[in-house]
Curated annotation (Swiss-Prot):
Its EC number is 1.3.5.2. It comes from the Bacteria. Belongs to the dihydroorotate dehydrogenase family. Type 2 subfamily. The gene is pyrD. This is Dihydroorotate dehydrogenase (quinone). It comes from Shewanella piezotolerans (strain WP3 / JCM 13877). It is a peripheral membrane protein. Binds 1 FMN per subunit.
Length: 339
């Protein structure tokens, strides 16, 4: 009830302004009695994945809390994990505004944010300040002005700095809003990146006495052959998980709607079937050797179960959370429990 009132108010605002307002509000109330307006008591439905035990299978996807400012608030809502970021080595403003658009009739969002964030050092300070026992994944990327062929260095810098504070690390090479980034999903560039990250993981495990799993986040706009090659590289480099999928450049299901022709990645309900197809193809290629977190267009509990049936072990929500509110978390967990 409270969320529907808040949503009505925020949907009158510019999308990015509304997002910033929400983050500011959650940041200030996450550990105060005021979190009673959104906190939910949810019966555990544990999932073991990547050698970690999560309290339930529903996580917050990266992009909502880029700088890790509201981890305790999202944990209070009942998320089984919170993925913060995407974070880059240096702060960057992202792309020019406007860069975030609602397509309300389709329950969709288009964004071309461009990894706007305060930098990895700021994120680390926020991770240190977390008071709850939230499972936090950190999604890492490269700075826009770092050449693609040197992008590996940015990922290694971020990994080094967040390692001891993260439950797991997600490697984002699939955002459509950083020029050239998606080229890292292919061939020698992918193998070199994954191999270097795996070696870094081994070094940091020895240094900190703690094994932090690493996952790769992929795009939905891939051919069957490309998915097969990515799966092969994940297996050969012994990655701990895959996250499927990021936003899409396609516009299926939104043609003719206001803002549908804006540049950027499409998320929300129209992405659901495409991301589920990719999850199924990826799962078939991985043959149970590497687990999958399914994300993309989940708007109902049934959507989440479809992704689990397709081969995902856990799911994440973002756009569906914007449109449906915290109740979606509870709905998915309850459906998962009785499945």
């Amino acid at each position: 009830m409270f969320y529907k009132i808040a949503q009505k108010f925020m949907f009158q605002m510019d999308p990015e302004l509304a997002h910033n307002f929400a983050i500011g509000s959650l940041k200030s109330t996450g550990n105060s009695p005021l979190n009673c307006f959104y906190a939910q008591k949810i019966k555990p439905a544990p999932v073991t994945m990547m050698g970690l035990t999560f309290p339930n299978p529903v996580g917050l996807a990266a992009g909502m809390d880029k700088d890790g400012e509201c981890i305790d608030a999202f944990h209070a809502m009942g998320f089984g994990h919170v993925e913060v970021g995407t974070v880059t080595p240096r702060p960057q403003p992202g792309n020019e505004q406007p860069r975030l658009f609602r397509l309300k009739p389709a329950k969709a969002i288009i964004n071309r944010m461009g990894f706007n964030n305060k930098g990895v050092d700021s994120l680390v300070e926020n991770l240190k300040a977390v008071k709850s026992d939230a499972m936090v994944g950190v999604n890492i990327g490269k700075n826009k002005d770092t050449p693609v062929e040197l992008g590996k260095d940015d990922y290694l810098i971020c990994m080094d700095k967040v390692y001891q504070y993260a439950a797991y690390i997600a490697v984002n090479i699939s955002s459509p809003n950083t020029p050239g980034l998606r080229s890292l999903q292919y061939g020698d560039l992918l193998d070199d990146l994954l191999g270097s990250l795996k070696q870094k993981q081994k070094d940091l495990t020895e240094k900190h006495g703690k094994y932090v799993p690493i996952a790769l986040k992929i795009a939905p706009d891939l051919s069957s052959e490309e998915i097969e090659k990515i799966a092969d590289s994940l297996i050969r480099n012994e990655f701990d998980a895959a996250i499927a999928t990021n936003t899409t450049l396609t516009r299926d299901g939104v043609s003719g709607l206001l803002n549908a022709n804006e540049a950027g990645g499409l998320s929300g309900k129209p992405l659901n079937s495409l991301s589920t197809i990719v999850i199924k193809q990826l799962a078939d290629c991985l043959k149970g050797q590497i687990p999958i977190i399914g994300v993309g267009g989940i708007n109902t509990a049934a959507d989440a179960l479809d992704k689990i049936d397709a081969g995902a072990q856990m799911v994440q929500i973002y756009s569906g959370f914007i449109y449906q509110g915290p109740q979606l978390i509870k709905d998915i967990i309850e459906a998962y429990r009785i499945k």
